[in-house]
């Protein structure tokens, strides 16, 4: 990597509409960028943002979602992912390679943040306010990437604009990675625009929402409550009202939706320039028609699924619209997997081209903010506020007005004397049903230290995995270390001489 010339190939996706609903023209933003002459104008700064988003879309692909979903207590793997069943960790070569690609895409996104962060302060054709605003967006994106890196790979090399030309770089402790994440998000909260420039770019509230979420990891509950509360009280977001599971799928996660009132930060997709999302093909079955007419996706591998016998599914109230949004009973191979298998339906794209679907990737929803606020309030003894936030989510899930009290549905603060009672009596179910198939629930389990307990209580209670392994029913499960941290790819050790694979590889992975 040479300091004189550092080239990035930035291909713009259609990020979305502005507030006046005008499209970005991607043909204006295809560059071979030299840092010696670039990052001087708003258009060039925007190209830098789009280049990062393009890599983030690659990082949060089908494997990202599949790998995190199959770790939960209610999802079962098959195909390439079947080797991870039973919580033995990631051992399949193809699966390991895919996780390595996630690692590399996140670092490419970080690199595409670092370069403009080093150059924008010297921009010749922007005001100080414009420079600060674009840098705020880049700090947000870098923080998001490092947050997902540290949660899946643990200690990693900390590459910033200050050391980006240093190739050989040792791993930094998890605490140091979080320190950078917090620092970046504080800069983002200060400098991001008040409103997103385009659908799919961050604003101050995006940064506040992510900062609050990160604070839960750090047990900074007062901070989490304050900043999640700021986002809620801003009035910028609201829950979309729905009356059926199909309504949910169309209005909240619908194919081709430009945006919704609960989008805090999504990665945008477009069929026009093939900036699409392939995860739907991992959950779909090519012959299943969810409304009798449309397939979920034109291509389907159904690499993971759930089962009616799993207690999480078995106890899911059928009046809860999220149930019909998320699952459909479909016995795709009864002789192997039993009669009670269910496909995952949250994302539906009947107009997909093969595995390419125009469904925006919901990294940060308003419901995540409400869940963050509820958890933080309960942690700090404000049970009434915690319950109020959860009740909004639950009311909407049952087709009711989320802002109107509903005695038949509402949780009551008086029922929960402490956090544990609140966790088991309200928060756990609302979080796992609301974030079902969004690659979030496993991190929630890890943050609470509940993975072993929840897996043991649900995964093998009644549902054999697979059907041929009926002797496993009821047996104790040990969650391997490899379920918590993915394997750092070999390329990182081959080219980064500050790392030693025997010393620096994550636990459980052979050299």
Model-derived features: where do they sit?
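Non-catalytic accessory segments flanking enzyme active sites
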Residues: 83-90, 113
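Active-site-adjacent substrate-recognition loops and nearby beta-strands
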Residues: 277-285
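Acidic/polar-rich alpha-helix caps and helix-coil junctions
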Residues: 2-6, 20-67, 93-277, 317-511
